[in-house]
């Protein structure tokens, strides 16, 4: 069975389903690396991607974001000139009630009898305005970090926005963007 469309799992409409000790056959996380780049250096700017609304991000999308952003930054900035961190973890267990289709499906299918479903994957639950991922860079590489965030936002189920912070944590997005456009 193939991967279902992401629009099925993107809404936060069901209660949290995370207690793995009660779930038989819960899959393991596909994403295992959450910090990439130069982890020990200090950088001038922090660029973070925030969720515009509450959503669930499947682990496949998180892994795709991780690979894409890390590859883009390594190629354009260099491994020692950035620190990239994914700030969410896929705890939510997704489940599916497999429906039998085809000839004589009524003989061996259960339909809606006991429809709770079997675990098929994991997702990260994100609240409105929560940071999803962060890149720390210096001033010369800020435009590459913004492009990486734009590319990462395309892989999310709902829209997202980025914010730029200085070392003290002050939001300086409008100030930095106004100087970059000149």
Swiss-Prot record:
<dbReference type="InterPro" id="IPR018255">
    <property type="entry name" value="Ribosomal_uL16_CS_euk_arc"/>
</dbReference>
<dbReference type="InterPro" id="IPR022981">
    <property type="entry name" value="Ribosomal_uL16_arc"/>
</dbReference>
<keyword id="KW-0687">Ribonucleoprotein</keyword>
<dbReference type="InterPro" id="IPR036920">
    <property type="entry name" value="Ribosomal_uL16_sf"/>
</dbReference>
<dbReference type="InterPro" id="IPR047873">
    <property type="entry name" value="Ribosomal_uL16"/>
</dbReference>
<protein>
    <recommendedName>
        <fullName>Large ribosomal subunit protein uL16</fullName>
    </recommendedName>
</protein>
<keyword id="KW-0689">Ribosomal protein</keyword>
<dbReference type="GO" id="GO:1990904">
    <property type="term" value="C:ribonucleoprotein complex"/>
</dbReference>
<comment type="similarity">
    <text>Belongs to the universal ribosomal protein uL16 family.</text>
</comment>
<dbReference type="Pfam" id="PF00252">
    <property type="entry name" value="Ribosomal_L16"/>
</dbReference>
<dbReference type="InterPro" id="IPR016180">
    <property type="entry name" value="Ribosomal_uL16_dom"/>
</dbReference>
<dbReference type="GO" id="GO:0003735">
    <property type="term" value="F:structural constituent of ribosome"/>
</dbReference>
<dbReference type="GO" id="GO:0006412">
    <property type="term" value="P:translation"/>
</dbReference>
<dbReference type="InterPro" id="IPR001197">
    <property type="entry name" value="Ribosomal_uL16_euk_arch"/>
</dbReference>
<dbReference type="GO" id="GO:0005840">
    <property type="term" value="C:ribosome"/>
</dbReference>
């Amino acid at each position: 069975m193939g991967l279902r469309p992401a629009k099925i799992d993107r809404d936060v409409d069901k209660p949290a389903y995370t207690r793995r000790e009660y779930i038989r056959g819960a899959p393991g996380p596909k994403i295992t690396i959450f910090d990439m780049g130069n982890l020990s250096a200090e950088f001038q700017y922090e660029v973070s991607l925030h969720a515009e609304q509450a959503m669930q991000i499947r682990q496949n999308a998180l892994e795709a974001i991780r690979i894409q952003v890390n590859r883009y930054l390594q190629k354009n900035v260099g491994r020692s000139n950035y620190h990239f961190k994914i700030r969410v973890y896929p705890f939510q267990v997704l489940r599916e009630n497999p429906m039998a289709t085809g000839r004589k499906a009524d003989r061996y299918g259960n339909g809606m009898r006991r429809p709770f479903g079997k675990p098929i994957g994991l997702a990260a639950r994100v609240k409105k305005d929560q940071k999803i991922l962060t890149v720390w860079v210096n001033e010369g590489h800020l435009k590459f970090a913004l492009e990486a965030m734009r590319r990462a936002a395309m892989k999310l189920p709902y829209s997202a926005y980025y914010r730029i912070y200085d070392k003290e944590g002050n939001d300086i997005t409008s100030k930095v963007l106004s100087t970059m456009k000149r």
